[in-house]
UniProtKB/Swiss-Prot annotation:
Chain positions with N6-acetyllysine modification: 149
This protein's name: Phosphomannomutase 2
Active site: 12 (nucleophile), 14 (proton donor/acceptor)
The encoding gene: PMM2
GO cellular component: cytosol
Annotated Mg(2+) 2 binding sites: 221, 223, 226
Amino acid sequence: MAAPGPALCLFDVDGTLTAPRQKITKEMDDFLQKLRQKIKIGVVGGSDFEKVQEQLGNDVVEKYDYVFPENGLVAYKDGKLLCKQNIQSHLGEALIQDLINYCLSYIAKVKLPKKRGTFIEFRNGMLNVSPIGRSCSQEERIEFYELDKKENIRQKFVADLRKEFAGKGLTFSIGGQISFDVFPDGWDKRYCLRHVENDGYKTIYFFGDKTMPGGNDHEIFTDPRTVGYSVTAPEDTRRICEELFS
């Protein structure tokens, strides 16, 4: 059972509310709207706002009390934009270019069954780096993900970057199936908590699937300000919520 007092449920998107990069199902959408009648709900994802809309609907800011794309670097509350932070003013152009150039030369040397396009996506709060390229098809995405599980392509890439850019104040975080994020230290999903910690919640629940060390849900999952639940799929999220808030 849930703890008494005002509470907020924060959900990761991919693998938690939806299948990776897929749209939310009608059943899950309806379930969350019912849940919202009992408790405040919010989403926090690494993706940009457009991708969150693609997955959760164009009216996402009306359907959730809080929407935090890019780990909360972009923040919406009660349907209105709260704030937007950007990576270039924080890190400076020189470091960003060094990072982009290094990633592109590393990707050029990696042999994969397939490579597509958009290897680096520049977002407000992070760089998203994909060895196969974000424009791959769903089938190619799954093929890469299966290969990555065996060969640790992303893990090796990240280990190399951590060595190369040690001491530069950067965090490298693997999430989803085909990419990893690079952002300033402290700009992980915990960043979104600054937007909610003064809103009077007694408990902030967090649900995510990449909660292991190195996963992009790990920091917020283990943060003392949250009660974390590790899930394997949207069905799992729903089951736990039903147990907590029935």
